[in-house]
Amino acid sequence: MPLLDSFTVDHTRMNAPAVRVAKTMQTPKGDTITVFDLRFTAPNKDILSEKGIHTLEHLYAGFMRNHLNGDSVEIIDISPMGCRTGFYMSLIGTPSEQQVADAWLASMEDVLKVESQNKIPELNEYQCGTAAMHSLEEAQQIAKNILAAGVSVNKNDELALPESMLKELRVD
């Protein structure tokens, strides 16, 4: 099985909250797709609550689009990581890590402005696969934590696992 890019970086050295360019690729028509690792918590040290990350999934995707989409950037998708330490964001364009960090912080401010659970978009059984698993309070606590900590940048070259270690860790 091929080694995915996200598994070539040392998760024990990742800062959080932090933005990282996880991957860039060119489409056949020449557009650049950039995938960002939006790391909310330090891997293997903390985890986002189920209800909190699920509610953020509903709120964050819209808020990030409001703050980052423009003439040269269009967000394709923002999805929570299975490890529940953050989100992956795929987009067309090449915004800087600082632009992404600024949009992230502005989005967290927006999360704090949501007044009640019934203001969460698509929170119903028709548009959400687990409509009962939400907590605006938990999502707002996550947002407060991000705003208090600020958002830094993780660089791939600083986190790259040595080839020898990748070979040693490989499961055949």
UniProtKB/Swiss-Prot annotation:
It catalyses: S-(5-deoxy-D-ribos-5-yl)-L-homocysteine = (S)-4,5-dihydroxypentane-2,3-dione + L-homocysteine. It comes from Vibrio parahaemolyticus serotype O3:K6 (strain RIMD 2210633). Keywords: Autoinducer synthesis, Iron, Lyase, Metal-binding, Quorum sensing. This is S-ribosylhomocysteine lyase. HAMAP family: LuxS (MF_00091). Its cofactor is Fe cation. Binds 1 Fe cation per subunit. Its EC number is 4.4.1.21. GO terms for molecular function: iron ion binding; S-ribosylhomocysteine lyase activity. Homodimer. Belongs to the LuxS family. The keyword Lyase applies.
